[in-house]
């Protein structure tokens, strides 16, 4: 598979790429046993979000640990495989930015969307997102462009971000058209499709 698909299919690779490029992420640990899960939770402090490193989507393969005594339940529910344990992010809102790149390096970036979820499922996106500071907009544009270049990505790429009091924190990315960009069908002259 392409480098983009390989990275996006594994949260361990994805977080490593974000870190390499200086894109902030939640603090995290990779674990592969019930004991290492408990150690990670103790180190990070509760609450944490535990996710499968592969095959998770729309809230599937995730468990929020509120207290340390929930570790065995989390492990029995989604464990017995490699997991990523992330510090819980107190965010103001989730944003996504979508960019498309040609082989000759021409690139277009769509306006950011604000995403509203219910039970881990995107319910609607508002685009363009309102009240985006110039600093936040510039950061998001820089991050998506750096990812495109580092991956040598040709096509469309979406980056999901949490806006916090400290700026932006990367959640995940997708090397495909994205549900947060469906607004572009009627909302732009050239949709993400």
Predicted feature residues:
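A short beta-strand motif that forms the metal-chelation/ATP-contact edge
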Residues: 99, 167-176
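Short beta->alpha transition motifs characteristic of CBS
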Residues: 113-116, 173-177
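Internal nucleotide-binding/catalytic subdomain
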Residues: 65-159, 163-165
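Acidic/polar active-site rim loop that often engages polyanionic ligands
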Residues: 17-23, 51-59, 118-128
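Conserved N-proximal alpha/beta basic substrate-recognition cap immediately N-terminal to
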Residues: 1-44, 55-56
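Internal helical hairpin/lid segments
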Residues: 191-193
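A short, glycine/Asx- and small/polar-enriched loop/turn
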Residues: 44-45, 164-169
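Glycine-rich phosphate/pyrophosphate-binding beta-alpha loops
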Residues: 174-189
